[in-house]
């Protein structure tokens, strides 16, 4: 890499550190000619698909819009920033792994809803109400009833999971998700 100060074509890396989220590497460099030091950030460059909007228009994926969607849905909700970041990364990962050059906006919306459903049910219903254009209280009620029935099914499956684990000689799982003695 060339030197930002003297334009010499050779610099050497004197220190490298991975960021906390593991997505970037900060490199400290020194110019072989003038001795000046500077830092660079190295990130992975992966193309995200172009988003096909409902009106047929196309636009580049915008991570800020994704962030805004999560922020609005989870406004004043007790969800840790770290979990929101993980959910956003999960959406981006799903889009990348789809391997498509273009993705309809509805796919992005469904990915966001899937992650919000795991994070916070109130945030999920908020997002769904806008995304699916709820018209009245009945639409909210219907979505909440779907959520409740899914929670009931997963609660009913826990005893089946415990029984299966015990039959295989594994300790059971209590309601808190911890292994029993």
UniProtKB/Swiss-Prot annotation:
Q: Entry cofactor note text?
A: Binds 1 zinc ion.
The reply to whether Nucleotide-binding figures as a keyword in the UniProt entry is yes
InterPro entries xref list = ATP-cone_dom (IPR005144), NrdR-like_N (IPR055173), RNR_NrdR-like (IPR003796)
Pinpoint the ATP-cone domain residues.
49-139
Cofactor(s) annotated in UniProt? Zn(2+)
Instruction: Provide this UniProt record's keywords sorted from A to Z.
Output: ATP-binding, DNA-binding, Metal-binding, Nucleotide-binding, Repressor, Transcription, Transcription regulation, Zinc, Zinc-finger
GO BP: any one term:
negative regulation of DNA-templated transcription
Tagged with keyword ATP-binding: yes
Mention any Pfam family matching this sequence: Zn_ribbon_NrdR
Q: What residue intervals correspond to the zinc fingers (unnamed)?
A: 3-34
An example molecular function term from Gene Ontology annotations: zinc ion binding
**Protein family per UniProt:** Belongs to the NrdR family.
Function summary: Negatively regulates transcription of bacterial ribonucleotide reductase nrd genes and operons by binding to NrdR-boxes.
- Name this polypeptide is given: Transcriptional repressor NrdR
Which organism is this entry from?
Xylella fastidiosa (strain M12)
Encoding gene per record: nrdR
């Amino acid at each position: 890499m060339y030197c930002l100060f003297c334009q010499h074509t050779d610099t050497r890396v004197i220190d490298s550190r991975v960021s906390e989220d593991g997505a970037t590497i900060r490199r400290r460099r020194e110019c072989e000619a003038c001795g000046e030091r500077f830092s660079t950030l190295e990130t992975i460059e992966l193309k995200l698909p172009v988003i096909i909007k409902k009106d047929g228009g196309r636009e580049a994926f915008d991570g800020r819009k994704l962030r805004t969607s999560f922020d609005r849905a989870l406004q004043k909700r007790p969800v840790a920033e770290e979990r929101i970041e993980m959910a956003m990364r999960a959406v981006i990962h799903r889009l990348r792994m789809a391997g498509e050059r273009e993705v309809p906006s509805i796919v992005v919306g469904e990915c966001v809803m899937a992650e919000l459903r795991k994070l916070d049910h109130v945030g999920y219903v908020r997002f769904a109400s806008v995304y699916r254009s709820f018209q009245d209280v009945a639409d909210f009620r219907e979505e909440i009833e779907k959520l409740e029935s899914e929670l009931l099914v997963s609660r009913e499956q826990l005893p089946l999971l415990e029984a299966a684990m015990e039959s295989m000689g594994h300790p059971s799982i209590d309601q808190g998700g911890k292994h029993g003695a």
